[in-house]
Amino acid sequence: MADTNTYQAQANELSQKLWAIANELRGQMDASEFKNYILGVIFYRYLSERTEMYMAEILENDGVTYEEAFADDDYRPAVENWSLSKLGYVIKPENLFRNLIRKITKFENDADKFSVEDFEKAINDLVGSTMGHESNKAFDGLFNDMRLQDARLGETVADRTDMIGRVMVKVSDIDFDLQDSQFDVLGTAYMILIGLFASDAGKKGGEFFTPAGPSRLCATLASLGLDEAKTVGDCTCGSASMLLEVQKHLTTHKVGHFYGQELNATTYNLSRMNMIMHGVDWQNFDIYKGDTLKDDKYGDGLKLTVQVCNPPYSLKWSADKKFEDDPRYSGAGKLAPKGQADLAFVEHMIYHMDDSDGRVAVLLPHGVLFRGGAEEAIRKYIIKDLNRLDAVIGLPANLFHGTGIPVCVLVLKSKRNGNSGNILFIDASKEFKAGKNQNVLEQEHIDKIVDAYAKRENVDKFAHVADMSEIIENGYNLNIPRYVDTFEEEEPVNLDAVKAQIKTLDSETKAAIDKAESFMRQLGL
């Protein structure tokens, strides 16, 4: 297990090497595009080394290497079946990452020299090996964003070969140990790379990536007190960072199955890569591509133990009348507004909550707490009819890429037991460390919020347990300042002291003017 110092050293080394790789591609394409090549190469190396590790383990007693077993016509089918069953894919020995690197750096003749087409074939062979197998759901189209024939890599095959070859060699120099589950290479790489493109014109990293602090907070709140989770879901999963974060906060770190849905094709691929690189077997996750609000890929029967989500804020959606018959949205009698789909995502999550002990932690803009019309009706339905809303937590501004607005966390539970007659409000807007470009929610801030949530007590200027009579009196308006008074009284002003100070200043001013006039008379002015 890596300690904190080891982790930081690994992260610093990775950061330096990623910058070096990024500089190989800089100027030839947009940063948000070259990340796809770097992550794709890192991911392929991971799959390759995982193959080698697994094959060495199962072939140890037979005393043969993977190359020898694969070359044997009698042995090969068994080896391929083992790899497909366990890993979900097959990488031929000649396509192993180390063998491709050897062709780049140690070729003995032109016939053995690496070409970008070798890497393209290796990827196609890998994905092709999953065709007709259940694992295809996890690997189909996974490398689509790494366009190895793109002219921006080079006008000729030789130019593209040189460019990709240099990136592959630099990736081969990154030191990561597959046995070291404490160091998340892909996740760390993604966080570094997102910094390169999140501020680019027209690019919003927040669409794909939830910073570590808010992600950790939601995962902790939603999994509090759970030993394990049968099912975990994120209906706008982005890079799947929040999905994976939940597992870390379960007592046993056990999740039966992960579910996610993502609209953006590039991010959909990244989320599947992230699951695999975190050691989640292909059998244990289903990430779907599609529009969650329009096309629920989960299906009617799926019920989830834990759900976390950071949906796109105030998204426009059709709010078509047909959705009035959708069981996810029909309960409130009104649809979320066309210009603000925020509560439609909440209704989707409520629909998929496990009835026995379902939990949700979702990040949303503050507008959902107090806007009227349809949103007021939906809030009332969630609170009064369903009794699912457990807590409202206000977070600091400027925590996210691409937006400086403050957001809140809504915590919902299907079984609220003794808390069914109240809602907890927490104002954590001052809980942050100021950063250069972005505020940071650190562990001490998360601990303070989670502790207040767990204790569920009134804390002056920080937390308030509001009973239902207060909620009703406020017309189901959940605006946090209505419940948590953060007003700081100013010290009383001593009027006599102020008058004396003014008198002194007047005297000093008059003396200065008299002195200036005296100088001017002496100068004849």
Label each residue range with its predicted role.
Residues 1-217, 222, 286-292, 394-398, ...:
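Non-catalytic, mostly N-terminal accessory regions of nucleic-acid modification and defense proteins
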Residues 3-9, 75, 295, 301-525:
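A conserved structural/catalytic subdomain of Rossmann-like adenosyl-cofactor enzymes
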Residues 204-309, 314-323, 329-332, 343-344, ...:
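Conserved S-adenosyl-L-methionine
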